[in-house]
């Protein structure tokens, strides 16, 4: 029954949302609203993540309200743009809790923004669904904190799984000096030890660096390296990719899921050709097998997104969609917006098929995705291609 409910909410949000509440469009306006707060980096260095998140949250809140709301209640969405600054994320989180009186928060585009919000939501007892990637967000488990994207640990595991298939066992790592990059480095080091991969180089670069040739020259001169992994967000990974090709490095180049967006390919240009990275099925929706449970969801989401914004679908938009749908499904199952009951309902999410995979949470797992929710993709002729 629960799986059916999840599927109904996800499907009707895109196609026939009147079925969510069973009411006619506009009827939701008479009831008390479900107050959803959001903090995203719609501008600033992480805008290629946060802008599509903001657009999707606003789009689906409006579509759900036009269809009658959730259980007859409209969704009242309050969105703040932190510009990629953790201190602003903390300030806006406090405002959402104390002034706006939200029932649940969806957001935290970056790991830094999320971790700035975590102590505030934990103290206040407000359910918080992060849109950021680092495993530290949910490990160890925090009572009120959940997340929708795959973790950096999973990304490292998927990359090393692919390396092993290619007979590669020696890795050079370049990580960004951001919260995401630091956590990604930590997880890569740990996973390498577990997977029998030797880390032969360990370099860092600044999130705003416009040239990384010094670090890459060290990698080029390292005779032991067989592959290179970059952990970063925004323009940095594109800079690394361009410098990589300019130096004539021929080793296989991997990126993290933090750049699973066409924006990365646009920024890196032809230098991105051949780059591999782990990503959600959303970026290769048309290439998924018809038997894949995600196929219908990601195909429909892609159509709605691209029809609405006249731009290619974004993985990060999908994270926001999943966060909102999980939150609203939990409201239905909790029978309202009592925060403790809502938190419990989010934790009890089972079998939600979203853009990131099939989500089954528990008291020990506040993300709910497994490694098979990730797909290895490669840039071919300026587009994503599923690696088989």
What is the role of each PLM region?
Residues 304-317, 328-384:
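Segments of small-molecule ligand-sensing domains
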Residues 1-35, 66, 97, 388:
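Short, low-complexity disordered leader/linker segments with a strong preference
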Residues 25-38, 66-74, 164-169:
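Immediate post-signal peptide segment of exported/extracytoplasmic ligand-binding proteins
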Residues 241-319, 383-386:
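Extracellular/periplasmic periplasmic-binding protein-like sensory domains
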Residues 34-58, 80-87, 109-110, 174-182, ...:
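Extracytoplasmic "Venus flytrap"
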Residues 96, 100-109, 129-131, 170-175, ...:
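Periplasmic-binding protein-like
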Residues 48-55, 67-137, 148, 205-209, ...:
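Beta-alpha junction/loop-to-helix N-cap segments that form part of ligand/metal-binding clefts
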Residues 91, 135-137, 143-248, 291-292, ...:
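Extracellular/periplasmic Venus flytrap/periplasmic-binding protein
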């Amino acid at each position: 029954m629960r799986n059916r409910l999840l599927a109904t909410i996800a499907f009707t949000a895109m196609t026939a949302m009147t079925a969510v509440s069973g009411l006619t469009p506009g009827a939701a306006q008479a009831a008390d609203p479900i107050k959803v707060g959001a903090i995203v980096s719609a501008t600033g260095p992480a805008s290629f993540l946060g802008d599509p998140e903001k657009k999707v949250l606003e789009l689906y809140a409006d579509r759900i309200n036009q269809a009658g709301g959730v259980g007859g209640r409209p969704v009242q969405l309050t969105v703040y743009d932190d510009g990629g600054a953790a201190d602003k994320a903390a300030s806006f989180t406090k405002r959402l809790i104390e002034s706006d009186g939200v029932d649940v928060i969806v957001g935290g585009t970056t790991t830094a923004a999320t971790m700035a919000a975590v102590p505030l939501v934990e103290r206040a007892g407000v359910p918080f669904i992060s849109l950021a990637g680092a495993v530290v967000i949910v490990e160890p488990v925090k009572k009120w904190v959940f997340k929708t994207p795959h973790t950096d640990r999973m990304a490292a595991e998927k990359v090393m799984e692919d390396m092993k298939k290619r007979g590669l066992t020696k890795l050079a790592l370049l990580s960004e000096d951001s919260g995401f990059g630091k956590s990604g480095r930590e997880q890569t080091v740990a996973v390498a030890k577990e997977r029998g991969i030797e880390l032969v180089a360990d370099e860092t670069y600044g999130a705003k660096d416009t040239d990384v040739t010094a670090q890459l020259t060290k990698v080029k001169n390292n005779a032991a390296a067989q592959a290179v992994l970059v952990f970063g967000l925004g323009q940095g990974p594109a800079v690394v990719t361009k410098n990589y090709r300019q130096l004539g490095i021929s080793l296989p180049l991997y990126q993290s899921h933090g750049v699973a967006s066409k924006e990365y390919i646009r920024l890196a240009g032809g230098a991105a050709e051949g780059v591999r990275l782990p990503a959600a099925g959303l970026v290769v929706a048309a290439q998924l097998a018809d038997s894949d449970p995600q196929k219908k969801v990601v195909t429909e989401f892609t159509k709605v997104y691209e029809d609405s914004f006249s731009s290619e679908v974004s993985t990060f938009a999908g994270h926001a969609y999943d966060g909102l749908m999980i939150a609203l499904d939990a409201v239905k199952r909790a029978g309202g917006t009592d925060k403790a009951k809502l938190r419990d309902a989010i934790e009890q999410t089972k079998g939600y098929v979203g853009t990131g995979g099939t989500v089954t949470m528990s008291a020990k797992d506040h993300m709910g995705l497994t490694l098979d929710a990730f797909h290895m993709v490669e840039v071919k002729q300026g587009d994503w291609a599923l690696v088989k």
